[in-house]
């Protein structure tokens, strides 16, 4: 199976729980997409838009979330009912457990909502508690126009406007970034947690 066909399957395959074994098999054979811009991604590119965490704490997109950090980022919505979001979230919970006390110290995890009108800080906090998320993983909301800029700057967009409007199309990937050293890599979110950890370590410069 060629890479183009694989990416198409990862983006478009129905996300019911019964499809999980197929998706996992595809993910294990996939190669992460390395992103290395010519001039680098810094504050003037990302912008410094205001957001809020699940606790209602105001933060700035670049200064507080990205600058000087190694990060793992994905987009979601708490009201997702297509079967994919809960599986992805549990996969990322397992990733956080593998990180242990590195999460919030060496690596910071961020989940940006795709539905800010629904996902208030209080709702995000309850959702986070239900997942059993530990420290170092922030759930973020804000004004839709600001979140759309964040989504575009982070590369969670599709060239086809019709597909880009499908919020489910943006929940099946995770972006790893090392802002100080300008290393960025994207992987399918249903890749085994151990493999995702390996990608974080590569981006962080802990292994070749």
What is the predicted function of each stretch?
Residues 20-48:
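N-proximal helix/coil linker or "cap" segments that precede and/or mark the start of modular domains
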Residues 50-71:
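A short beta-strand-turn-helix
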Residues 88-110:
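Conserved helix-turn-beta segment immediately C-terminal to the redox Cys motif
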Residues 163-208:
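Thiol-/selenol-based redox modules, centered on thioredoxin-like
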Residues 5-25:
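N-terminal export signals
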Residues 126-171:
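Short, internal strand/loop/helix patches
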Residues 65-85:
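Short active-site neighborhood of thiol/selenol oxidoreductases, capturing the structured segment around
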Residues 106-119, 136-145:
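Thiol-based oxidoreductase modules, predominantly thioredoxin-like and allied folds used
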